[in-house]
């Protein structure tokens, strides 16, 4: 999970929130009259008055009484309006430099203060969690409005809506796009205390998620058998899911282990799991009967209750406060989709539902049932048999990854070779590796973005005492994909405001490009898009779209029930998960009323992040289809870098520049239909 992009997206949403509680000063300035009278030197009817007036009007909308009088406002406009293209470009360069400095310093503070809680460097104390929840950017927006830098930015680089960017952007050059993205920096205003409260709630949820380990060696069947290694500890949901997926290979007790993990997941989402068994090796737990033993004696333990859902509710309450300051996008839903993803939630929902109800889903489900030789079960949403690695026993892969990567430094040393295996030139492979730091993670691992051209990207990965197991390696390769994109579209970009990609879904697509080539990076030969690879992406879309709908519908429910309790939210989420399951999954996988779709931990600490994954899968497939035309690994790497260097356009503009067509599920539906027809 690309946490830093989420944090920066949150910053953008916070910086684009305004007040309803303070009446704006009634100020304004007619530039047409000023041009006619000569009040502003260099301003005349031939200059870009419409764009300039737009900036003036947007400044006026955010000007408060404490910012000054009408006379002060007019003086401000006369002093700071860049009336010539040359002056405007110089100002843009200076603002860009300052923004990069601010972002870099804030990022470094966040990294260092968060080290004890996110890295595997000893047990963090309560004080560490307090420091990690500190938002070093919380006062940035306030400060920039107070010293008028925000107003200067708005005046000269006004904001354009998503619709305007998509309609006008086709005629913009790179500098105009960069100006437009500068216009996204300050659109409204929010108190620092509100943004800090959002950070604190999220940090608390992260702390809960990051230590939610299930001690697999202490899980019992009803007959008292143990199927997992004594020291196996799996983080929910990531490692539980990946262990379940690994059991599609020919390993002892594979089916029994899958059923047990599924039951554990059910107990977690229903909150029937005994609270004391989480991250605790002192108890043996039989998840099917929910009985617990300590030192061979059965004990009675209270369930977790509604703690899981309390974290969602806490974040909702902080977003409610944020809503009051955001009249343009007055809900977290609007800010997430229109503001961050740059697609409306209805647009995303329609895309997902169209996919979930396609004939191809049932046909591929039937294909999986034939391969498995049994009726499908709910956990078959994670069927892993379309990957070549699924026929290689995981213990063999784990033995290899542990030998190669006993620690984080070993993985880092091997990065240039991995990149060369993908076709990157030796010098570029070394450059990228030199700008990525690898660190041991406390949680599942993540990629932490470099936001300034004086710092590295950071790959946080989970490495056990015996070295990196295959699950950890696969996740690390995903995060490595994030890092390569992060370094490339920052260090090789033409304008700082265009650094990055359009949204989180796009960077997830870039990470998927690496993750599906994990064996190629390991040395198993070139991996290309074949029928199984297409089916694998298709089935991944099917799984994560349902999970995403549960997340989206949960937040719609919260806004419809703003006074909900944690227990009420728990019941609602379970109901939503079952309804989505019954409508889109039961016809394919069977089992009425399964709550499995509520298992993803993202719902707790990164609300509405999940839709980025299926959108990312859609983008990923379109990229794979495009990159398949490359005749060699070197051509693949060259084209990939060209796509990276487009930077942060809107999603549709970026996609058209990447592959020549907008974001669409049609290519993969057509490809899957062709595969089914030919089998």
Task: Please give the residue ranges for each predicted region.
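Sec-dependent signal peptide recognition
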Residues: 2-8
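C-terminal motif of bacterial Sec signal peptides marking the signal peptidase cleavage site
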Residues: 15-16
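Active-site recognition of the HExxH zinc-binding catalytic motif
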Residues: 459-490, 511-512
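Feature representing long, continuous alpha-helical segments
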Residues: 482, 508-516, 544-552, 575, ...
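C-terminal, non-catalytic "cap/extension" segments appended to globular domains
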Residues: 22-292, 297, 319, 323-392, ...
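Alpha-helix capping and helix-loop boundary segments enriched in small/acidic/polar residues
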Residues: 446-447, 463-475, 497-506, 537-541, ...
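Auxiliary, metal-adjacent structural segments of Zn-dependent hydrolase domains
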Residues: 393-455
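Post-HExxH zinc-binding segment in Zn-dependent metallohydrolases
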Residues: 314, 488-492, 496-539, 550, ...
């Amino acid at each position: 999970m690309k946490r830093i992009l989420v944090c920066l997206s949150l910053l953008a949403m916070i910086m684009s929130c305004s007040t309803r509680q303070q009446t704006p000063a009634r100020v304004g300035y007619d530039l047409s009259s000023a041009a006619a009278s000569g009040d502003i030197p260099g301003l005349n009817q031939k200059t870009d008055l419409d764009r300039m007036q737009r900036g003036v009007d947007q400044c006026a909308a955010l000007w408060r009484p404490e910012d000054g009088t009408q006379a002060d406002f007019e003086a401000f406009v006369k002093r700071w309006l860049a009336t010539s293209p040359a002056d405007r470009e110089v100002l843009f360069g200076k603002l860009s430099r300052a923004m990069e400095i601010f972002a870099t310093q804030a990022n470094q503070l966040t990294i260092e203060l968060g080290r004890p809680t996110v890295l595997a460097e000893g047990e963090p104390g309560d004080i560490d969690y307090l420091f990690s929840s500190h938002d070093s950017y919380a006062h940035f927006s306030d400060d920039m409005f107070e010293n008028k830098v925000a107003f200067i930015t708005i005046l000269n680089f006004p904001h354009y809506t998503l619709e305007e960017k998509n309609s006008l952007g086709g005629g913009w050059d790179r500098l105009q796009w960069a100006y437009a993205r500068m216009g996204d920096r300050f659109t409204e205003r929010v108190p620092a205390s509100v943004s800090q409260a959002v950070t604190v709630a999220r940090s608390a949820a992260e702390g809960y998620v990051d230590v939610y380990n299930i001690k697999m060696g202490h899980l019992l069947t009803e007959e008292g058998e143990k199927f997992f290694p004594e020291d196996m500890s799996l983080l929910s949901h990531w490692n539980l899911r990946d262990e379940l997926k690994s059991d599609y290979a020919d390993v002892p007790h594979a089916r029994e282990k899958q059923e047990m993990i599924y039951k554990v997941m059910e107990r977690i989402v229903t909150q029937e799991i005994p609270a004391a068994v989480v991250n605790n090796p002192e108890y043996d737990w039989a998840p099917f009967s929910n009985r617990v033993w300590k030192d061979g004696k059965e004990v009675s333990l209270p369930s977790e209750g509604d703690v899981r859902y309390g974290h969602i509710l806490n974040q909702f309450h902080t977003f409610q406060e944020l809503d009051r300051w955001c009249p343009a996008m007055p809900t977290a839903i609007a800010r997430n989709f229109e503001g961050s993803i740059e697609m409306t939630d209805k647009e995303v929902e329609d895309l997902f539902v169209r996919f979930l109800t396609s004939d191809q889903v049932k046909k591929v489900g039937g294909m999986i049932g034939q391969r498995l030789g049994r009726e499908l079960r709910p956990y078959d949403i994670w069927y892993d048999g379309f990957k070549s690695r699924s026929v290689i026993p995981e213990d063999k892969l784990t033995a290899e990854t542990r030998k190669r990567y006993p620690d984080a430094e070993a993985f880092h040393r091997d990065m240039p070779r991995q990149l060369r295996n993908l076709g990157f030139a030796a010098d570029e492979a070394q450059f990228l590796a030199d700008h990525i730091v690898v660190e041991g993670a406390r949680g599942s691992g993540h990629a932490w973005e470099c936001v300034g051209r004086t710092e590295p990207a950071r790959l946080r990965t989970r490495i056990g005492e015996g070295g990196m197991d295959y699950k950890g390696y696969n996740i690390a390769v995903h995060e490595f994909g994030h890092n390569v994109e992060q370094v490339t579209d920052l260090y090789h970009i033409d304008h700082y405001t265009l650094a990055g990609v359009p949204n989180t879904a796009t960077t997830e697509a870039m990470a998927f490009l690496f993750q599906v080539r994990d064996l190629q990076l390991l040395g198993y030969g070139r991996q290309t898009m074949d029928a199984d690879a297409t089916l694998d992406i298709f089935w991944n879309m099917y799984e994560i779209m349902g999970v995403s709908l549960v997340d989206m519908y949960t937040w719609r429910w919260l806004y419809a029930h703003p006074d909900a309790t944690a227990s009420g939210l728990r019941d609602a989420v379970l109901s939503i998960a079952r309804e989505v399951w019954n409508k889109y999954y039961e016809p394919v996988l069977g089992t009425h009323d399964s709550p499995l779709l509520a298992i993803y931990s993202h719902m707790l600490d990164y609300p509405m992040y999940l839709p980025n994954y299926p959108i990312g899968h859609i983008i990923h497939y379109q990229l794979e289809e495009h990159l398949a035309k490359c005749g060699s690994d070197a051509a693949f790497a060259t084209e990939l870098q060209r796509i990276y260097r487009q930077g942060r356009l809107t999603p549709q503009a970026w996609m058209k520049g990447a592959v020549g067509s907008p974001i669409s599920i049609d290519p993969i539906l057509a490809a899957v239909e062709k595969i089914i027809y030919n089998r």
